[in-house]
A protein has these predicted regions:
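Helix-rich "cap/lid" substructures immediately adjacent to catalytic or cofactor-binding pockets
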Residues: 1-18, 168
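Phosphate-handling active-site elements
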Residues: 2-9, 38-54, 86-88, 203
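A short glycine/serine-rich beta->alpha loop
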Residues: 16-25, 58-66, 123-128
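DPxDG-like acidic metal-binding loop motif
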Residues: 26-48, 75-77
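Alpha/beta catalytic cores of group-transfer enzymes, especially the acyltransferase/condensing modules
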Residues: 48-98, 187-189, 193, 197
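Short beta-strand-to-loop capping motifs
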Residues: 84, 105, 198-202
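Active-site rim beta-loop-alpha module in soluble metabolic enzymes
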Residues: 102-167
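Glycine-rich, charge-dense phosphate/pyrophosphate-binding loop(s)
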Residues: 144-203
Length: 203
């Protein structure tokens, strides 16, 4: 309000179809909606980068932490790569045949689920595991660059965070095994979970 000299008070109600606490960026979606809505309401003429920055501030207010990757995707749509310090957002176009399937389990999400999920991540990792994850992340980017859905999906392999968190999702290993057997190229935890996301194509 101070930056833009807005004197009005405002009450915002958001109706969305993103369940809170299921690893799908619910708080980021709310923050992005507020940033985009206020930009239009007050004709602030913010750039995409500014919208992402302010949405990040909004998410910190609601969720306690900024997730620029989540708010950037919510503001810009599609897929993004985010660099920080300084903040830089790169939007990337997916292959036309890429399909993502999200399974949302009927679970009662515990209080402070994201904080608990973060606590499960190891503080130290082996060099070999780090190399594997960086290699797979590079494979995902290469898949987008080549518009190759299979390469993207087969590169969705996480040997650090997924093993540390999967015990919090009942039946995760069985769901992943069955999805891969059904033709998915890759399966992993969506965000901090407990939703599970599978990557495939129109074949």
């Amino acid at each position: 309000k101070k930056k833009f000299k807005i004197k009005d008070g405002i009450e915002i109600k958001i109706k969305k179809n993103v369940p809170a606490g299921f690893g799908m960026g619910s708080s980021a979606a709310s923050a992005a909606a507020c940033a985009v809505g206020l930009n239009k309401l007050y004709n602030l003429k913010l750039t995409d980068a500014e919208l992402v920055e302010f949405a990040g501030i909004g998410e910190k207010a609601s969720a306690g932490t900024i997730h620029y990757d989540n708010v950037a995707a919510s503001v810009l749509g599609g897929f993004v790569i985010v660099k920080t310090k300084p903040l830089q957002v790169v939007k990337i176009q997916p292959p036309n045949d890429l399909i993502l399937c999200v399974a949302v389990p009927e679970l009662k999400v515990p209080a402070k689920k994201t904080k608990v999920s973060r606590g499960a991540i190891p503080k130290k990792v082996s060099l070999s595991d780090m190399v594997k994850n960086i290699s797979n992340a590079s494979g995902i980017v290469a898949g987008f660059s080549q518009r190759n859905s299979e390469l993207i999906g087969r590169s969705v392999q996480d040997v650090i965070v997924e093993p540390a968190r999967k015990h919090m999702i009942p039946g995760f290993d069985k769901v992943k095994k069955n999805a891969l057997a059904a033709g998915a190229y890759g399966v992993t935890i969506s965000g901090a979970g407990p939703s599970v996301i599978a990557f495939t194509d129109k074949k």
